[in-house]
Amino acid sequence: VTIPYPVVDYDVHPAFEGPSDASQPERSAAFAAVIGQLDELFEPIRSSDQPLSEQRVRRMSQARLTRCLDDARRLLHAGQGPREIEAIDAALADAAIQLPAEAAYRSRMGERNHGASPFVSPVARAIDETGAFECQLDADGKQRLIDLLEPRRRLVDEQRSKHNFYKALTIVPQRGPEADLVVDLLNDVGIPAGFAEFFNRKMSLHFWTLIRSDPTEVWWKDPYRDAGVSTSPTTYFHVDARFEGPKVMIYLSDVTDEHGPFEYLPGSHRWDRSISLEILNKQIERAHKKAWVNENTAYYRPYMQLEEFRSALMNLPTPARQQSHFGDDVLEGSELHAFVESNKRTVLSKIADCVAFDGNRMTHRGALAGGATRWALQVGFEPTPGAARTAVRRGRSAAASLLGRKG
């Protein structure tokens, strides 16, 4: 059964007024057609029988990609002021880099797409089937990690400035006892090896972030108070901004519903949507954050609270309005709210204290503490530079096949 990925209808949201540009409906249809062309270009690459290098994908796609982005630019510019036009241009420049890079990255997973090599490890199977792998870590080893992290916990407690409203401390690990223990704990349950199998390349530790979540935080609350809209029950459900690099969430304390548990929508990594549109919209969001500065709020998407920005957003073609962090914009009591609530899975510490997942595709949230403080570790992985590929590939020429299918 094909499940469509959630789409927020901003036309019915009380915080957003309809587009002021009369050409918006017509441009929306034309923009959807451009996205269809991008999908025709990149989907065969993503599902290639052989891995393709980023350089090769760029050569294969450059001419058509340039035409598509030029068409998108015309449709996105219409009805906009100078600030939004500048943001759109920056986003399209980034998209010209990210779209081929993402397609090349996914081409390394071709056997997963074709079902030629079933996964062996429980980690890879779970990520393939639901988007996440849940487990319990060794209790003694985790306690040693908690003890090692105590000085850093005190440091997070001492940081109260608005610049650290997540109450988090990110560490890019060099070799050291904390990083080594994190990797040992994850190796014990097969997570790095499972990542290597699923993504068809070795993954290395990239960063880890120590996060304290408590009920006093406001960064996720009441974004649309000015419009009389309360915090959405689905707030902070999102996909991550990147396209590569899986994550692991480790609870460092007991977690119940009151602590802001990790939640996800099982299978959402397979729900039907345009990956090309998702990659493009992530670049638009990133450009919006830089262009539309709002220092008068603690909300983590400050630009969404600017009336001028909301007007600019509504003048964009409808598909380009969609946000990676869509959960904040779902109206309570709506069909979309019911859909998310009926599909979500909540991971309490009695179920699992560790979750490995592909947050760039699988929809998830966490850290929304309602009544008690939660301590957790978020661990990021990235492809190991120059790592040998880990799966046997079919020996067919991917380039010839792709050129034939591109038509």
Enumerate the language-model features and the residues they cover.
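Short, conserved beta-strand element in jelly-roll/cupin
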Residues: 238-257, 349-350, 380-383
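Non-heme Fe(II)-dependent double-stranded beta-helix
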Residues: 7-10, 16, 27-31, 35, ...
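Extended hydrophobic/aromatic segments used for targeting, binding, or gating
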Residues: 379, 384-404
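A short secondary-structure junction signal
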Residues: 218-222, 230, 247, 258-267, ...
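Extracellular structured ligand-interaction cores
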Residues: 130-132, 234, 243-249, 259, ...
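A short hydrophobic beta-strand segment most commonly corresponding to one strand
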Residues: 247-250, 266, 372-387
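Double-stranded beta-helix
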Residues: 258-362
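Short beta-strand His + acidic residue motifs that chelate non-heme Fe in jelly-roll/DSBH
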Residues: 362-370
